[in-house]
Amino acid sequence: MKAKTLKKDKVNIITLGCSKNLVDSEVLSGQLAANEIDVVHENSKLDHNIVVVNTCGFIDKAKEESINTILDQIELKRRGKLDKVYVTGCLSERYRGDLEAEMPEVDAWFGTLELPLILKQFEADYKAELLGERMLSTPKHYAYLKISEGCNRTCSFCAIPLMRGKHISRSIEDLVKEAEALVQKGVKEIMLIAQELTYYGLDIYKERALPKLLDALADVKGLEWIRLHYAYPSKFPLEILEVMQRRDNICKYLDMPLQHASSSMLKAMRRNITREEMSELIHEIRSRVPGICLRTTLIAGFPGETEKDVEELKEFLQEHRFDRVGIFSYSHEENTSAYDLEDNVPAEVKSARAQEIMEVQQEISYEKNQEKVGQIFKVLIDKKEAGRYLGRTEFDSVEVDNEVVIHSKKKLAIGEFVQVKITKAYDYDLEGEVVG
């Protein structure tokens, strides 16, 4: 049954999972608002009557969170607090048939590419001319820019292609228009995201076009920081580094998930790269862009992982001293090629290995942060909390990296850039004072 778009209707969008999901929710919000439907994000006031849950289905913990959130909304509906509950996103795409049977209280389920169908529930029209128009749920000074959808890689552990489909690039023209629209809204920093950045353009331009896209975005007036997330290491286009070095508003920052460093694990994961090749690439990146911040993500407990593999990974971290590291325990996902392997590393061992690896990185992070004491950095003010300002350098992305705690006698504006001298350093944070 369709939701009646009466004046009293107010839609709350709850977003779970990654920044790519967040962009999808912002696009949906923009379309609803353009159809004169009242919409909010993560509304805790319970003054809405319709909910759209945008789910994540990436790993077990994410699936659990998504299911619990849906159940919470169903309970609110049962108590008469909500009229409608709709579910979209990766969990819905992947398990819709099962979930429909288990949760009949949900009014409708949608996949990841069914925005027009969601809008039909509100008797709203999909407005193609609004491509790129979004209702931002982030602070107005930064936003994510999703440059493509889906992924053509075949990593053995990853279920994302099952939920998001094959790689589809957006055109450079459309992305530049969206970036310009974001800057008009007050955005100063854009984080480029995709399942895999470096594949960008191969489908529509028959070449790896990320360097051309970066050059075009760097020309957008008023865009002060452009940040790159999720670059695949195999066949990495080195031309990206030339653009990064040449253009001042492209952050000297690269998020490159490596997943492991043991060659046997990399082969089992189908990463199409060896430890030696990764080492060569890291040296090349750092030689071409001195001072670059390298972030990576790792997996602990992949099937067949031995203590020797873990030691190799720790040695790799100590050798290459990444600036930022995140780690996940392996999740055994059905319909992936790794699902045919025995999930033979116990959960407690996965957790212990992840902790062990992060302890190595924690020491590296502390040492690298200590080196920053006394230096002056350009810092973007993100928020004010407990009487202190919190910001980031160009070497830190939102939520996952260092924060700079800023002491200032004068009032600072959220979204303002200031020069900060670092006075103290901790494992994952810095302190400093405004200078100049």
Language model features: what each stretch is:
Residues 1-200, 239, 250, 254, ...:
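Proteins enriched for Cys/Gly/acidic motifs involved in redox and nucleic-acid/cofactor modification
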Residues 184, 211-212, 219-226, 236-298:
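Radical SAM/AdoMet-radical enzyme domain recognition
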Residues 205-218, 238-252, 305-323, 347-352, ...:
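Short, electropositive alpha-helical surface patch
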Residues 193-195, 229-231, 257-259, 295-299, ...:
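Generic beta-strand/beta-sheet core signal
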